[in-house]
């Protein structure tokens, strides 16, 4: 009997213990990362051949305390390596762990290697060679604080490498992880198993091999024990022959195919088919291209299990399409798989909430570095009500759920808004406008339409609102938006908006570089919905830009703090004599230039200037008839000499603007500070007059948000 150790992924130790016991292991003891056990030769080989959960099977040779690299070297060079392999074989050292003295795994591996080759030299043998690619012998060293365990790796290559997977889709599951998911899924052999997003087919292939009694390592050609002197070839051949006969018997029973794999990508399905063929289970699995939104139960009145590892993102805010995917998936499960079991493995528990199902059991696990969860559900039998709705001779089946519609109040409000605002926008020839702006306090978000795209901007929840509850409401709202608008999931963008500090509104979020243009009162304006927090177009200033276009005829126009120059476009299309566009950001100034070119606006009379707007204004000696200034509420950018506060500094700004404003000129001044108070007395001292026009510049889609901006007409006193 030998003392052995089976390694596995964290979270699967107890499951592995059950498997090892079933395979004949004795005295199994669970520790983090694996199971200690004892076994005779026959059981040892059976575990190597049949374990679906083990990553490696290790034979410990040295267990000792080490406090320095000399201790490490001494422990290795003192081991009798010739009892395990001779000098003609190649070897490789895998070293894991550190302590105070051995602080790098590469150094640890080198010292183990030195000890082994020096041992052979001391015994009059040639130094065995190291082979990093295909070693005959693999030595596994593990250091935990001061305790060292050095083992012979009987597996060779890791046991998750079954040999059937030639190619994969994105983010494939390790075979050992897939087997664990299947074993925890509540699926029973002989019953249907459906994977609606099967990818390269690993879950189904692992399950099918269990059904077909195919040992996972049956076709492995090279083992870590091939050149080990303790290898018992006779016992090994016996165990392997038993496995071959079991697989043949199962094949001769002509098992009925009851595994189904669906995927939207036909190229990935071809890989899955090839993998299944290599694994010897292609006759058991049916593959079909299909979208989750149209998922149908492929069986006839049978009860089975749906198993799935859907895609998931590490950041929920970048994956609105996944919210839609899980929502639609949950709906199809309830519609098509009544009385079935469902097991879903995901790295984002919040996405599983979108299924709108209640798990009766869940497990934690790791998928590489990601913390994941597997949840098991049972789909309740739903009442099916057949309503004879005659519509083009079609009969509609209406399914009545015990659950109420997700975010029903929000969905109803959104429908109402769309009906009103879409009609108005079509009349105004607009295709970028707001559909919803925190109308209901519990759904604190904005929904904007940009042509055939939808942006959902979540306002940061107050500190007293439970984070999980806020996240669930967001998921519910996104599901409702997809249902109400019918938009394609890849055209919905989700952003989290918070109070901006300094120039953070200009910070880049992504680098997709996807631009398209929208129409606004005859102007065409480029927008980018993904790369920045803002899109390049402030929708609430739409009427202000229109007004500027109407006022600009024959005038010299200045756009200060110009952003992407959309106001300049309107002024130029309004036949301004000249335009000057000033902004500190080169990115946005280039954007402004592209906006002008998009509208065929060219010429020396249209100037674009990159500069600190306040510093440029101090030096400007040119006069203007019409000035639009929409400064930030606050800024402390390193590129500005001084900080800026619109409430504190607006009179100083007006004093500078007065200097360059012609006698009959007009300043259109706007900002987004809530509760802004114009210093009327300060303006009078400057001999300027101000009229607030905020209400006149609020378009229909922003009429509920009276404080989104304030706007003023400022002129010289007559």
Swiss-Prot record:
Keyword RNA-binding (UniProt): yes
SMART domains referenced in this protein's UniProt entry, alphabetically: THUMP
EC annotation from Swiss-Prot or TrEMBL: 2.1.1.173, 2.1.1.264
Pfam families reported for this sequence: Methyltrans_SAM, RlmL_1st, THUMP, UPF0020
Annotated ranges, domain THUMP: 43-154
Family statement: Belongs to the methyltransferase superfamily. RlmKL family.
NCBIfam families: PRK11783.1
HAMAP family: 23SrRNA_methyltr_KL (MF_01858)
The protein's name in its UniProt record: Ribosomal RNA large subunit methyltransferase K/L
Source organism: Histophilus somni (strain 129Pt) (Haemophilus somnus)
């Amino acid at each position: 009997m030998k003392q052995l150790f089976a390694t596995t992924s964290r979270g699967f130790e107890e499951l592995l213990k059950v498997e090892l016991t079933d395979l004949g292991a004795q005295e199994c003891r669970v520790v983090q990362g694996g199971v200690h056990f004892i076994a005779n030769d026959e059981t040892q080989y059976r575990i190597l051949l049949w374990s679906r959960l083990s990553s490696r099977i290790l034979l410990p040779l040295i267990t000792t305390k080490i406090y320095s690299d000399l201790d490490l070297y001494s422990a290795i060079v003192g081991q009798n390596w010739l009892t395990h392999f001779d000098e003609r074989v190649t070897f490789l050292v895998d070293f894991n762990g550190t302590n105070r003295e051995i602080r790098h795994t590469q150094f640890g591996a080198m010292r183990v290697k030195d000890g082994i080759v020096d041992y052979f030299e001391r015994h009059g043998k040639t130094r065995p060679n190291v082979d990093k690619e295909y070693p005959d012998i693999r030595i596994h060293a593990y250091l935990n604080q001061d305790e060292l365990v050095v083992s012979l790796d009987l597996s060779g290559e890791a046991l998750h490498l079954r040999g059937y997977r030639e190619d994969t889709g994105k983010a494939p599951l390790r075979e050992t992880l897939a087997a664990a998911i299947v074993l925890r899924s509540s699926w029973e052999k002989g019953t249907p198993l459906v994977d609606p997003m099967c990818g390269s087919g690993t879950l189904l292939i692992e399950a099918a091999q269990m059904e077909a009694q195919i040992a996972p390592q049956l076709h492995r050609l090279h083992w870590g024990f091939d050149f080990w002197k303790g290898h018992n070839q006779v016992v090994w051949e016996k165990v392997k022959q038993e496995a071959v006969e079991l697989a043949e018997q199962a094949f001769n029973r002509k098992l009925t195919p009851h595994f189904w794999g669906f995927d939207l990508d036909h190229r990935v399905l071809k890989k899955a088919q090839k993998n299944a063929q290599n694994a010897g289970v292609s006759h058991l699995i049916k593959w079909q291209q299909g979208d989750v939104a149209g998922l149908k139960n492929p069986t006839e009145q049978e009860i089975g299990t749906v198993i799935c590892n859907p895609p998931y993102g590490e950041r929920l805010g970048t994956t609105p399409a996944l919210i839609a995917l899980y929502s639609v998936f949950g709906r199809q499960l309830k519609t098509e798989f009544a009385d079935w079991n469902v097991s879903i493995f995901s790295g984002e528990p919040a996405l599983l909430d979108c299924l709108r199902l209640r798990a009766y059991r869940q497990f934690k696990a790791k998928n590489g570095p990601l913390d994941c969860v597997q949840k098991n559900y049972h789909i309740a039998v739903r009442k099916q009500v057949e309503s004879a709705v005659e519509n083009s001779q079609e009969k509609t089946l209406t399914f009545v759920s015990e659950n109420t519609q997700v975010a029903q109040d929000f969905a109803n409000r959104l429908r109402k808004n769309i009906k009103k605002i879409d009609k108005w926008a079509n009349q105004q020839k607009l295709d970028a406008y707001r559909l919803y702006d925190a109308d209901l306090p519990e759904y604190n978000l904005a929904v904007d339409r940009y042509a055939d795209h939808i942006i959902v901007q979540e306002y940061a929840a107050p500190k007293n609102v439970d984070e999980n509850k806020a996240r669930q409401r967001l998921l519910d709202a996104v599901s409702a938006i997809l249902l109400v608008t019918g938009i394609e999931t890849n055209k919905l963008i989700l952003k989290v908006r918070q109070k901006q500090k300094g120039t953070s509104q200009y910070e880049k979020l992504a680098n997709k570089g996807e631009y398209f243009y929208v129409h606004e009162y005859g102007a065409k304006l480029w927008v980018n919905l993904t790369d920045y927090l803002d899109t390049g177009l402030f929708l609430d200033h739409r009427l202000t830009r229109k007004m500027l276009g109407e006022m600009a005829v024959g005038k010299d126009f200045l756009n200060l703090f110009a952003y992407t120059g959309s106001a300049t476009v309107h002024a130029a299309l309004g036949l301004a004599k000249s335009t000057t566009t000033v902004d500190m950001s080169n990115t946005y100034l280039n954007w402004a230039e592209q906006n002008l070119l998009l509208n065929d606006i060219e010429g020396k009379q249209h100037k674009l200037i990159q500069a600190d707007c306040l510093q440029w204004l101090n030096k400007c000696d040119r006069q203007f008839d019409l000035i639009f200034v929409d400064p930030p509420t606050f800024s402390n950018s390193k590129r500005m000499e001084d900080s800026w506060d619109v409430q504190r500094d607006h009179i100083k700004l007006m004093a500078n603007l007065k200097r360059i404003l012609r006698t009959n000129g007009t300043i259109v001044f706007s900002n987004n500070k809530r509760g802004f108070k114009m210093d009327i007395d300060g303006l009078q001292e400057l001999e300027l007059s101000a009229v607030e026009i905020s209400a006149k510049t609020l378009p229909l889609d922003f009429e509920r948000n009276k404080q989104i901006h304030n706007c003023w007409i400022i002129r010289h006193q007559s």
